[in-house]
Amino acid sequence: MSKFIPEGETYHVPSFQWMFDQTLESDSHHDEAIFVTESINESGVDTSVEITADGTLASYMHAVKPLVEDGLLNPPFDQARWGLCCKNVVDVYDGLLGYRLIPMAEAARMLYLEIDGSFVDESECDDWRPVDTSDGFTEAMFDVMNEIPGEETKNTCALSLEAESRQAPETSDMVPSEYTLADRYVTTREEFASVDSDYDISLNLVSPVEFRVGVCEDTYRHSEADDPTMPQYHDRISLKSLEAAGHHMLPTHAYFDDTYYQALEELGDYNVDISKLSVRQSDVDWYRDPEKYYEPELSIGSFQRRIGTQKTVLTALKKRNADVPELADSVDIKRVACEVAEKFKRAYLNHSGIGLLGQSMDVMSRGLEYHKKWKDHKDLTGVTVLSEINLQRYQHMIKSDIKPVVSDTLHLERAVAATITFHGKGVTSCFSPYFTACFEKFSKALKSRFVVPIGKISSLELKNVPLSNKWFLEADLSKFDKSQGELHLEFQREILLSLGFPAPLTNWWCDFHRESMLSDPHAGVNMPVSFQRRTGDAFTYFGNTLVTMAMMAYCCDMNTVDCAIFSGDDSLLICKSKPHLDANVFQSLFNMEIKVMDPSLPYVCSKFLLETEMNNLVSVPDPMREIQRLAKRKIIKSPELLRAHFESFCDRMKFLNKLDEKMINLLCKFVALKYKKPDVENDVRVAIAAFGYYSENFLRFCECYATEGVNIYKVKHPITQEWFEASRDRDGDWFHDWRNPKFPTALDKVWRFFGKYARDDPMKHIEERDRRHRLNRAMNSSLKLAYDRRSLSKDKETVAWVRKTLSK
């Protein structure tokens, strides 16, 4: 026997007769005797029914074969769970059509009973592979040779049977035509192309083979990345990506820090050239405590809070009020003023609304509104007592917040603070109702083509104003306030009289604007000015708007303008044809330096105007300016103040949700054209996405500043530049308020005994009478008089009530 045959077993010589005689293969008795076995049906289920996984009770009984005990099934039948298991199996098998899998019912049973295992049928899979020793003839070839014509082989695979049972019946014999790549890419032309190193075509690299190729064009371009109508996706917004975008847009603003600029200005030498000036000792402390303000996370050219010291005020006066340009020629002021006022009236006022100008102004109702505002808070600070006041004397101050710089000059020139010249609250409250009522009359007679965003129409969002195929005129008037002279004052007088403003008030207002005195009591600076605009009185915005409209009407034909927006010294003209503006008249007649932007864009009041699908206009703030406002350094550490800045930020970004991809793409091109920077379009997209992200809620906005949550603040170490949480309780903090009841403690009393601490109350041993005198002298005189008058009125009421009671 062979060593491969175990003892006790006989070796049968295999017969290959079946390869030539089909009768041996189809012996039914032989097949039944060997391969068919009878299964014992313990659950009483009819096994002759085809096993499927359709979620019914019958399929559950056939697949799971539960035991029946006292009428209950074990495991119990849960129809919802069994149906979900069957559905999951069908979904999985639809995606695994190329694999040999176990029957669906068995897979559903494994999921239902939570049995671990694989759905792949590995019963006939092994690592053994037969060695091909044939001479080219296979079993399939013999089957084809011996196939009986007209006889169909029936597929008995369980998976195929289940797939056939789930097939939906065809309702139509027509096959629908579907969209293919051949329909999308169409060959439009043919040309000859060469292949430099195609070895499959030719080995002659000196003279490469040229062959005809078809040039295809994509008929469905909406899925391309550069299509302007498709959205472009970016990474998640972060402070690092936003700061990188800001540094790329404004390279000179990167890591700008002016912490020590105020100290350098105060400690260095100073030279100023002003013709007439009065200077005395200043009482302003230029030190700025950095621990009182939020530290922004971004470093994109934001400025520190500017303090109005004497040198800072002199620098601001030098730029904003001194050195008035003298560009105009000698003209007849009275005649030219009448001509300008007449052109203003013909260009802007409607003929049907001129009759409204003769009506009386509703001044009393406007004065009542101001009185109600004062009554709500009853703030007596700055209220003028009924006495004689010099209207030619103006108070002066500087703006602590510096306007964002959008030019690449931050490394060469320090931005100068803007100045504010204003009357007291008493004078302003007296004149404001008159100018408010005058503007209401003016707006009723104004043509609808011209828009002045103030009051109830303060928004730049306009309806039915298309921007497509239009020309724009964007003019920049530099040195606008101090360039105004006597001519501007005179045609303002004529315009106010034509609008129905009372003549005595008009003449009075214009007369005390001829010569005025600017006074800054804290900085100790006084300077006389003449004719130029006062930047903080009751007529500032309305007057600047009237001056701009009058000069534009005199130098440009307003009949060709479809729409015009005027706001202070900002203006924007929208025309069907290219507008013509005589810039020489601005210089020779109105003493103004004007610069017409090229190209002129729909840009006004630091906002871009974009057109929606319904031909409406929405305004979007300038991203170059807003990205710097996210890094303000003047916000005091207070959750209420930080929330106020957040609400202001949300108000400016209220139209971001109306922007579609076309409008965003247009905005990016507008920014690139305005600032002559063609490579900032992607940075503008990052900035817009950041504006939408940080305007979602207050906590996201707090991420822009050194805060942890809302009420806990982080502090940066001045040397290690690390963030840490520190306590703010120091001995010096207790002495700021000598009325503090917590100080001193027992230990502090011991230290005071040895002379380390000073007294709590420096006025403790002073008599009550002397103390009251010192406190009253320290108070503001107008505030003291107001309090005294209020106390006197109460005393008079008390005396009158006592007398009335005694008389009864």
Swiss-Prot record:
Taxonomic superkingdom: Viruses
Domain RdRp catalytic as annotated: residue spans: 470-583
Keyword Membrane among record annotations: no
EC number assigned by the record: 2.7.7.48
Keyword tags: Nucleotide-binding, Nucleotidyltransferase, RNA-directed RNA polymerase, Transferase, Viral RNA replication
PROSITE patterns (alphabetical): RDRP_SSRNA_POS
Catalytic activity: RNA(n) + a ribonucleoside 5'-triphosphate = RNA(n+1) + diphosphate
Gene Ontology BP term (one): positive stranded viral RNA replication
Family annotation (SUPFAM superfamilies): DNA/RNA polymerases (SSF56672)
Gene Ontology MF term list: nucleotide binding; RNA binding; RNA-directed RNA polymerase activity
Protein family (similarity comment): Belongs to the ssRNA positive-strand viruses RNA-directed RNA polymerase family.
Function text: RNA-dependent RNA polymerase which replicates the viral genome composed of 3 RNA segments, RNA1, RNA2 and RNA3.
Subunit structure of this chain's protein: Interacts with replication protein 1a.
Protein name: RNA-directed RNA polymerase 2a
Organism this protein belongs to: Cowpea chlorotic mottle virus
